[in-house]
């Protein structure tokens, strides 16, 4: 089974649009393929723009006018019959399913795994009502995954120097690195 480590940047919290989709596919022979898509959208909520720094104008340039539908065949094929691993799977899957439904496509992955939910009882970070969901940087710290290593691996995988936090390329690589660190530490994870 191929494993797809994935992250999205979006127009906001409600299922609007995905503005950036990045993932790393790790095949059964441990070979890796990295993909990054930028999508042109009509509107980005101000709070979302503050987080990821992408305006409608910037996205139009980065995407060269492409929208999600232009990548839907590739995305469907890549996620088909896979294990999709994300940090907050409910959020990413909701946006992906919404975008795919607009293209008359069904969710193609076989199963999902959420590092955020899985590691909540392991990290035991205090919250207002029991343990809080760990942020990705908190999980990285717990698993001893330095941001510099993630940045270097993301640059290598995606072939660019322009990778930073709240960039889906960085975040999906961080999920990959955390997952691999957890496996190396002997923590039980799906494979």
Show the residue positions of the predicted features.
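Residue-level "edge-of-site" marker
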Residues: 62, 113, 153
């Amino acid at each position: 089974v191929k494993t797809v480590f994935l992250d999205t940047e979006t127009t906001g919290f409600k299922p609007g649009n995905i503005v950036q989709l990045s993932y790393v596919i790790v095949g059964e022979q441990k070979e890796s393929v990295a993909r990054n898509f930028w999508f042109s959208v009509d509107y980005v909520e101000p709070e979302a723009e503050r987080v990821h720094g992408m305006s409608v104008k910037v996205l139009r340039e980065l995407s060269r006018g492409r929208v999600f539908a232009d990548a839907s065949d590739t995305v469907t094929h890549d996620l088909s019959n896979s294990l999709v691993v994300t940090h907050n799977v409910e959020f990413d899957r909701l946006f992906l399913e919404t975008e795919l439904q607009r293209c008359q496509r069904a969710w193609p992955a076989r199963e999902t795994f959420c590092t955020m939910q899985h590691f909540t009882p392991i990290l035991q970070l205090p919250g207002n009502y029991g343990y809080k969901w760990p942020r990705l940087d908190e999980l990285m710290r717990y698993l001893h995954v330095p941001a510099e290593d993630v940045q270097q691996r993301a640059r290598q995988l995606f072939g660019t120097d322009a990778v930073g936090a709240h960039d889906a390329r960085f975040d999906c690589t961080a999920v990959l690195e955390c997952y691999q660190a957890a496996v190396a530490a002997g923590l039980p994870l799906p494979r």
